[in-house]
């Protein structure tokens, strides 16, 4: 088994106990309020983990909206499915660099607390760009600062010890190279957010 999949499978049942879920929910709610999410959007939650972001998103979405939530860890997906029961959500075990979705499908994609874990960030970015509709948005978001993210990964397990989050401006520059328009790139000691957009005209067939 892929060591990273095994790592996340092993911690799936422990994940929600490591953080105050009420406090996390408040942080997510405040962040989502700033993102001008329409009630009818079709959204992809990449690296959904135990479903915390999906759960927060559902509170902002209407009955016609859809959330596709994917993760490489089958156990994480099982925990999420048990915790978040809503007909607007589809749960799948899938790799972010090779998703099962049609091109130009999603209005918005979230990578919440997951980006450093992608083994091939360029391939992942290109795949997410493919499934985004023109002018659709990608959010790379962490609710803690970059230094803390990297410190946690360095000491957690050899499976994730090299999973480094780049400075926001450096990752934003890469997203530009990979065909996105960057709308914002900000980081503080307690926050990290890059919002990017797929251009209206991409030259793709």
Task: Label every PLM stretch briefly.
Residues 122-134:
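A short glycine-rich, Lys/Arg-flanked "PGG" loop and its adjoining helix->strand segment in the class I
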Residues 1-36, 52-56, 76-79, 137-162, ...:
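Conserved class I S-adenosyl-L-methionine
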Residues 44-46, 50-98:
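Class I SAM-dependent methyltransferase SAM/SAH-binding core
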Residues 97-108:
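A short acidic, Gly/Pro-enriched loop at the edge of an enzyme's catalytic core
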Residues 163-178:
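Short alpha-helix
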